[in-house]
Amino acid sequence: MASKYPEEGPITEGVEEDFNSHSTSGLDLTSGNKEEPLISLALLSMHTSKIVVWIRDHFFVKILSFGGKQKLYYICNQCHKGIPESGYITLNTKYYLYEKGPTETGTKGLTLMRRHVQNSPCFLNSRKESGTPKTDPTRPATSYSLCRSDYQEAGCSRPTPSNSESVCNGLGQPSERGHTSGESGGIMEEVSFISWLEGLWGEGFDYAN
């Protein structure tokens, strides 16, 4: 049975940035405008210009091009090209943690680092020190080693969820507001495809700012 996903090739139409310059090593950006009705319906309600989504073991980047045309481009299948168990993708100055298997909440997909976490002194210092966020492939939620070991020295304030931020689990049901790691103080927000769709019509999912 032929694959429903596009063949590999460079991203061309609608691109406003060189995403390769923002991606971690191992990510092979490939193209493909998807026309699935469910995805097309979701794109009608997107509030942001660029976002990464996970759909059945494949990664996509959604791009809003000039003229308001919205397109979904195929990035890669997480099971090939030597993609590690976990890592970071940077798009539109936002950091996404991707994982191969089920997350702590039982869903699969991408985790968006909340703005007040990715702008925290410990995260910024860890990037300055190593070039990329420090990751633990077995426990990605506790990957902020600088925050964990030099918590006070880095001047990190433990982030807390905002009342305006809502989180849905992989079934589209309300869940706890993010993943809190007692070691690192980091708060994560689940962005599986179903919760992403669910959040399009809710509050707290406008990633444009």
Swiss-Prot record:
Transcriptional transactivator that activates the viral internal promoter (IP), thereby enhancing its own expression. This transactivation is repressed by nuclear factor I. Also transactivates the long terminal repeat (LTR) promoter, thereby inducing structural gene expression, initiating the late phase of infection. It is therefore a key regulator of viral gene expression. It directly binds to and activates DNA target sites of viral promoters and those of distinct cellular genes. Required for viral replication. Residues 1-30, 123-143, 156-185 are annotated as: Disordered. This is Protein Bel-1. The gene is bel1. It comes from Feline foamy virus. The keyword Glycoprotein does not apply. Keywords: Activator, DNA-binding, Transcription, Transcription regulation. Transmembrane segments: none annotated. Residues 21-30, 132-143 have a biased composition (Polar residues). One of its GO terms (molecular function) is DNA binding.
